[in-house]
């Protein structure tokens, strides 16, 4: 199973997180399948590769709580619903 979760980067006392698609059994710092964005909690900046996130969500990837909140602010789930309604028609 694949999850979308945060992977810690940066230096001591200055954490930056990458949003990655990673196998559930991997460690937090383990090998990721693909980098799909980043999150800087100090500057409160985010970048999301929305098409990549949508691809993994459509394939059944589960976002963690924090990644879910970040994606919700970026309105990824609205685009997911739009894509699903288009494919149903």
Curated annotation (Swiss-Prot):
Protein keywords: Chloroplast, Plastid, Ribonucleoprotein, Ribosomal protein
Gene3D superfamilies registered for this protein in UniProt: 3.30.1320.10
GO biological process terms, semicolon-separated: mitochondrial translation
Organism phylogeny: Eukaryota, Viridiplantae, Streptophyta, Embryophyta, Tracheophyta
Pfam families registered for this protein in UniProt: Ribosomal_S16 (PF00886)
PROSITE patterns noted in UniProt: RIBOSOMAL_S16 (PS00732)
Organism: Drimys granadensis
A single Gene Ontology CC term: chloroplast
Keyword Ribosomal protein: yes
InterPro entries associated with the record: Ribosomal_bS16 (IPR000307), Ribosomal_bS16_CS (IPR020592), Ribosomal_bS16_dom_sf (IPR023803)
Keyword Acyltransferase applies: no
Family note: Belongs to the bacterial ribosomal protein bS16 family.
HAMAP family according to UniProt: Ribosomal_bS16
Protein's cellular compartments: Plastid, Chloroplast
Chief site of localization: plastid
The protein's name: Small ribosomal subunit protein bS16c
Stored PANTHER family: 30S RIBOSOMAL PROTEIN S16, SMALL RIBOSOMAL SUBUNIT PROTEIN BS16M
MF terms (GO), sorted A to Z: structural constituent of ribosome
